[in-house]
Regions:
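Secretory/extracellular carbohydrate-interaction modules
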Residues: 58-130
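Bacterial Sec-dependent N-terminal signal peptides
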Residues: 1-22
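Short, aromatic/His-centered strand-loop micro-motif at the edge of beta-sheets
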Residues: 132-154
Length: 205
């Protein structure tokens, strides 16, 4: 009886472990079919195993949907967001100052329907956009060291039961409750005459 009980525990543990999927994208093969973009405002393209975003515009009074749609890339990830997820990636950017901003896009349906996490100035922002209009937002003071030639960031997004936490270099940038995420669309954007390299996207789902 004892052996049967131990066997059952082992089976349950293995089942629970196998239910968690871990996948990784390094951009070498573009296996997740990321969009690439080139225009006067900038470029989003894969080079040397990273997704590079180059913004050439710092136009004032720009709307969020214009910003997200100008220099951005997205993919539909191999995961079910309803199960919750732990997503990690790295970002390397040149001097972060002035009007420069960058971030990630979650719950992406199209450029006018998504959730945008943005680092700009001394704050981290989260915007919920629907039909091109901001229908919800949250911010938190979050300072990056400015003036360095290159800044390397480890970004982590943890979503579970409607609660969203975003950490940068293991420091909490935002904690948001009651944030429904139903789409597996995910992406990056940059704005304000800057260059950002994204790499090592890893998902635990």
């Amino acid at each position: 009886m004892k052996k049967k009980f131990l066997f059952l525990i082992t089976v349950v543990a293995l089942t629970a472990t196998s239910a968690v999927a871990q996948v990784k994208e390094t951009f070498d093969s573009n296996s997740w079919q990321w969009t690439e973009y080139s225009a006067e405002l900038g470029r989003a393209y894969i080079i040397e195993g990273v997704m590079r975003l180059e913004s050439k515009s710092d136009k004032a009074n720009i709307t969020l949907d214009e910003m997200v749609g100008s220099v951005a890339t997205h993919s539909f990830l191999p995961m079910d967001p309803a199960k919750g997820f732990d997503l990690k990636c790295t970002a390397t950017l040149e001097k972060f100052e002035g009007k420069k901003s960058f971030g990630i896009i979650l719950d992406y349906i199209d450029d006018m329907n998504c959730i945008v996490f943005m680092i700009k100035g001394d704050c981290a922002w989260l915007y919920k956009m629907k039909e091109g209009k901001i229908v919800g937002q949250q911010k938190n003071q979050f300072k990056l060291q400015k003036g360095k030639k290159n800044t390397s960031l480890d970004i982590q997004v943890v979503y579970q039961g409607g609660e969203l936490e975003i950490r940068v270099n293991d420091v909490q940038a935002l904690l948001c409750k009651y944030v429904p995420i139903t789409s597996n669309g995910f992406g990056f954007f940059a704005f304000g005459k800057c260059k950002v390299d994204f790499d090592d996207v890893e998902i635990l789902n």
